[in-house]
Regions:
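Signature of N-terminal electron-transfer/Fe-S-associated modules in redox systems
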Residues: 1-152
Length: 152
């Protein structure tokens, strides 16, 4: 176990320990760049003290590479990663959305991701990427079910 200062934000602790996907943005809990999972729920690591996370499960994008890999390609395909600075927060929140609601509609996606700020792409690329990913995922799952039923 590591000694930490009582006022150290989780964001700073994670970055000091090599979790560089967690970005520093506004430091006021408004931009979503510092999103991590705390006990499987998305939280803003700039607004939580590292000491409060002691004993909890903390997951950063580094721990979700496999789950994020396919999805990120759809974001990139839509040109939604111009500078890429906001991507880790978007990806973390999109994964949380997919886990919570595997079939969100466009309004649910917009609402869920409303806490993520992007300086350069206007969100439309991210939205198109998410919708295309969900369509691809549903088609893939449907094909998998059809193949499984044909094998019986």
């Amino acid at each position: 176990q590591q000694e930490i200062e009582p006022d150290l934000p989780l964001l700073d602790f994670l970055r000091a320990n090599g979790c560089y996907s967690v970005k520093r943005g506004c430091e006021t809990s408004n931009c979503g760049l510092c999103t991590v999972f705390l006990n499987e729920k998305p939280v803003l690591s700039c607004s939580i003290l590292a000491a409060r996370a002691d004993g909890s499960s903390v997951t950063t994008l580094e721990g979700l590479q496999e789950e994020a890999e396919e999805f990120v390609a759809f974001i990139a395909d839509q040109g939604a990663e111009q500078c890429g600075f906001c991507n880790p927060g978007f990806v973390m929140n999109a994964i949380a959305l997919f886990r919570e609601n595997p079939q969100p509609d466009e309004n649910e996606i917009k609402e869920y991701l409303s806490g993520n700020l992007c300086r350069c792409s206007g969100y439309e690329g991210q939205l198109r990427g998410i919708l295309n990913f969900l369509e691809w995922k549903n088609t893939k799952e449907l094909k998998g079910k059809e193949e499984a039923s044909c094998g019986k």
